[in-house]
Amino acid sequence: MLFTSISFLYYFLPIVIILYFIVPKKFKNFILFLSSIFFYFCGEPIYTFLMIGEIFIAYVGARYLEKHRKKSILVSLLAIHIGALGLFKYSDFTINNINQIFGSKIPLLKLALPIGISFYTFQIISYVVDVYRGKVKAQKSFLKLATYVSLFPQLIAGPIVRYETIEKELDNRTSNFENFAYGVRRFVIGLGKKVLIANMLGELCDVFSTTNEKSILFYWIFAISYSLQIYFDFSAYSDMAIGLGRMFGFHFLENFNYPYISKSITEFWRRWHMSLSSWFRDYVYIPLGGNRKGTIILVRNIFIVWALTGIWHGANWTFVIWGLMFGIMLIIEKLFLTKHLEKMPSILQRIYVLFTVMISFIIFNANSIGEAWNNIIGLFGANGESLINASTVYYLKSYLVVLVIAIIGSTPLLKNIIEKLKIKTNANKIINLLEPIAMASILIIVTAYLVDNSYNPFLYFRF
């Protein structure tokens, strides 16, 4: 079941909301847990039991860990949860590489990847490690821990919510009109970003992938379009998750903060998928020593973190290269580039970031290293295509409006204009009046689109 499906929008979600608000407070977590299990079961009937099993192991293990505080217990728990992730996500990748290197013929396991396993595994790991560190107390209620891990708003594609972030809200959270209204508004904005912008950009990217009439300009259009698509697709899911969480009284942390206005790669990763980058910082980079043990250890730690970040996204060498590319850029910035960047005009700093990120997403999108390389050199005419052709002009005209909207929407320009207008009393009243009309209009347009286009998964579902 997808957030962008008629069944979710007009059946599942309204029923859950009604049940949640009519039951007594002590049953609210139970309603959310059952709803989340049903939500997951609709997409992954068999793997629902895997998730529940992992939650139970974390529940029992964390309580035992809190009493005995032994590293061996922590290592055992981490081995179980990381092992489950590795089995389903990386077994065939590992076997395939062994076969290629040694010429062996080990059969592939061909295990389907459980949806959301990368996200809920990281949540479980953060919970267990924080219990070991004494940052949080082990949850005594299995229901509350299960609700935290399986909470349907963020179960499938994040953001990665730390247990400490919503620990108190599992016991006591405020459900009021202000929270609910904010949640609805945030959800609808995300819905619009996904269906009306990300999906349209996805259509343009699909055209590029299938057409034989490429040009140098079309390579650039594709690179820009995919960079915008993945931003709007993933940030839309985060908006919807944060909005859904707020409807039920949970305050999830932000996951994106206009990353494409960054002036360095370091800043970019403080603005892009913030829950993932902060997770690797707190649970891998800092435990390895961070930047406290000299340059060689710093470089080693960054390489490890970004190799893991790449492989977390998928079992393909393109993801490893994508991660290591960012690792190398971050090392270069830390060692010497930052001081030179700061002396450059802001526009040049941003061009440097946008070009680097665009190249990285070409690699990220590719199914193979060869495909990635072909699309990168195509930007510079090395594939022999003409600068422009009739097909490129046609598709540019067809998608120009959505490209312009996406470019503007990826910056805080519109947000800043609205905030400045709100300072003026009369303008603020007009905005408050128009806002619900705008939200209703988006919902109507999206619904009309979804009636004819029933399946439109988020890009991050495959991770």
Model-derived features: positions:
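Membrane-embedded transmembrane alpha-helical bundles that form the catalytic cores
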Residues: 1-462
